Amino acid sequence: MNMNPKIIAIVIVAILAIAAIAVFLVMKNGDNGTTSRSEATDVRLTIFGNANGDDYIDQNDVQYVQDIIDGKKSLEDAPKVQVLKQYKGTYTIRYWADANADGKVDQTDLNQIKNMVNKVKGTKIYFFDVDSVLASCTYPLTTYAVGYKSNYEAEAILGNVANCKYVCNQVGDNGGYAQWFKPFLDQNPVCFGSRFTPDYEVFKDNAPSYILSGTRAWFDPNMEETVAPLGTDVVRLPFWEDTTTVGSILTLGYMCNLDAAAQAYAAKADSVLDKINDYVSKIDTADRPLVFAGYNGTSISTWHNGIQELIVAAGGRTPYDEGYTNGSIDGEGVNAMNPDWIVFDMYYGLLETNDQVKEYNYIYDQGKSNNRYFNAIAGSKAYYDDKVLILGQGVYMGPGSYIGIAWVFNHIYPKAPQFDVASLLKDYVENYHPDYKNTDFMNQDCFDVTSYDAWMSSNVSGYQKVPKTYRA
């Protein structure tokens, strides 16, 4: 791809300016801001033109819009969503039947949906992104640059590894995630550096069709403007922010013309999510188990960080349901909350450091030195009753999250039909990480306080269980 030297100069100047801002933000806070809770409806395929709000763009959507135009259906009753025209702007309503997202549903939308059903190349697709922003791309998406582990997972699930041309420094440059994504490295991709401050100059001679990105709080927020002169689209979908990722896989699958792989993944995840939803739909929120989930028992996470969402998906009640807000919480606060269950999220196991000894000792050491994990919740009734679960990142957030959700559901609803979590993990690993075995991860990604104590007592000389200090 040849570019006008003036355009190259403009792009480079913009990159330098944006990089300076991003470096400041990373040094100051580690991110670009606080993520907000998604305003999406129950629609999972978040592409405008999915008029009836199901998981497909097909002839049913054509008929739906035709019925609106003919007055047979009321537009007011059609599926809709609150969307931002620009990041951190003002919300406005858009109907999913509004394929070109111009604020009205008419013949133009009908024609566009027909093109979308027929998969006409060059069709401009409008979609709802991770930050509730109205975004667009050109169909079909092909070659790409990708950053962060859950995004690599998504491309692997879709069978789209061969189109990878650029990787971030967490996989490239022998980064910490390289061991999990060797098939991507086999494509000889170029490393573009950090997802916060990408080196966009590496794209200029062979620009990718799109960049698979994420929330502007944790990826360069100015990415769209910077790569626009290259003709590269930016796709920001929630591959970890909402824990479950079925909708994001379906959406990206359509955009890349890889619908079959997306639907196959959806069937796996829905085999868990639908059964849980059916079971808990009969239970009022106030009657569901209260679950306090977090990284190490010392804070209540914001929405849109994948933690509260896991509780909801597993059928639990969150601290927010009890009037709590995000922020730090000490042992006394946990005791006052009195959760039925407590869940920790570890940066170990599948897609992280694959070392059970390090993981278990990390919990122990952090408890003693920083009053985290079991030390932080020692006075809680949940700890007294051994109702503490630990999940690894690979099954806690992202495409593998339905496994962790099943594990939590099994425990908080022990009388419900139980999921075979080991089989779910085996299927996931064999399909998407065939270089590994599920037995490598079960004791790292899904374990509880009882099994943890048993292992530590048998393997760590001088191990002392954190005393239970709960008093009724």
Where are these regions (language model features)?
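Sec-exported extracytoplasmic/periplasmic mature domains
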Residues: 67-74, 115-119, 149, 156-160, ...
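Alpha-helical, coiled-coil/dimerization segments enriched in small aliphatic residues
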Residues: 172, 305-326
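Bacterial Sec-exported substrate-binding components of ABC uptake systems
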Residues: 37-41, 102, 114-156, 260-292, ...
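Secretory targeting signatures
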Residues: 1-32
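Cellulosome-associated attachment modules in secreted, modular CAZymes
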Residues: 20-125
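A short, structured surface patch at a secondary-structure boundary
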Residues: 142-206, 210-217
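Structured C-terminal subdomain patch of bacterial secreted/periplasmic proteins
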Residues: 221, 241-256, 263, 351-471
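Extracytoplasmic ligand-binding site segments that recognize negatively charged/polar headgroups
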Residues: 145, 170-177, 217-222, 237-251, ...
